[in-house]
Amino acid sequence: MQSNRTTLMWASFLTLVAAGVGFATRAASGPAWASEFNIPSSTFGMIMGAGFLGFGVFIFLGGLLVEFFGYKKLLLLAVILHLLSAVMLFVAPTLHAEWEESVGIELATKNTVSLLYWSVFLFSVCAGLYEAVINPLVGKIYPENQTHYLNILHAGWPGGLIVGGILAACFQNDTAWIVKIPWHLALTTYAIVLVVLLLIVIKESFPDTVSQRGNVKVITLFSCFASVPFLVLIVMHALIGYMELGVDSWQTRLMENLVDNSVVVLIYTSFLMFTLRFFAGPIAHKLNPIGLLFVSSLLAVGGLLWLSTEIGSVLVIFAAATLYAFGKAFLWPTMLAVAGERYPQSGAVAMSALGASGMLCVGFIGAEMIGVQQSDATANYLRENHVALYEEFRAPEKKSFPSWGGRFNLSLFEIQELAADKQQATMNNSDDPNSATIKAAFDFGSRTALKKTALIPCAMAVGFLLLLIYFRAIGGYKVIELEASEQGSG
């Protein structure tokens, strides 16, 4: 047993807290970016999507690197790069002002979008390296109950969302509870957690990885990909990433007009997730991990469909958010536990492959798709009900999806969206005679996006049901010990 495993658990926990703080404050920055830089919902979604692209690539590459370079070196690299991403955010307003003077507002906005995009991308690279280290590390130092301790570890993510959400509610946007501060100050607060984390990692010793401990062949690390159930798990985790992280990216923005300060909904659901993840072990022992995933998917469907209805009561909004939180709480960490318990011979590779699929899906498709669905439905509402306002507010150019498709001459479809700065300014000005109509259109778009997203956990439920049937057919879900795993697993 690793003598300092509690300290290592805390260090691992703090990586997710830092990521959660950055994510929550960034998710609440949409109104500020729309007003200050004229960034529309679709572009905001693209930037938020960058917060998953680097994660998806580097959690998988990190899974390979950690096997051969060890936990400590990779974790130190991630913390340093994470601090650099905070610096990029901090200087964005200053650089935008300088660019506006030198090259004009249009190029200044374009350059600022690029700076924000690459800062968020670097943030996601670090998050990917964190996950590549901490998931197999916690699985290794707590082999007796991986589902329980991986869920506790991943309580750090909603814990960070709570801290970041409170910061956003108190200090971001016009609805700030205490005082509105510049958005870049709020967004860089995660650097405080990183300094504490850096001090812990420097002085602690870490255990060896699977590859460092013995003469393990590379082909053994990749043997999980020869298992059909594992390939199904990859698809399921991609859908989990789309649903959980895609909706989290948009939750604050989508509920902007439903409650006085929409960040409180994110804080509330994050608090529920934080609490629930400490009780995953006993629940998983009763249902088994696959059963827990199946039930969670069904609850997520109900929660999203409820949130997508026209709700007039704040209490009902929180009730629907409660159901959704119960649905999503156990999905991500329990999937990682299944990878660790069923494919121990693959070390960090199996867990990293699942994490990569989730992040790549939300990065390339999910976050932007939800934004596109919201923008499209908002514009359609005006076009069908208020033609004159639609003509007044519509953006001069159509938006292609996916935004990165233009680089490869690939565009699945185009939408007509509204001009972001004009839309946001009208919604913020209650004296504007068009404010109520634009808010109604925005709310309709938000509900439509949530309703369409509910199809994702529907597909997840079908997949987990098939896995339940499979494991029952082979005698039930069993944890595979590393010594016995050389013969392969299913």
What is each stretch, according to the model?
Residues 80-109, 299-312:
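C-terminal ends and interior cores of transmembrane alpha-helices
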Residues 144-145, 152-209:
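Helix-loop-helix hairpin linking two adjacent transmembrane segments in secondary transporters
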Residues 7-39, 135, 247-252, 366-367:
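Extracytoplasmic
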Residues 100-130, 316-330:
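Hydrophobic core of transmembrane alpha-helices in multi-pass small-molecule transporters
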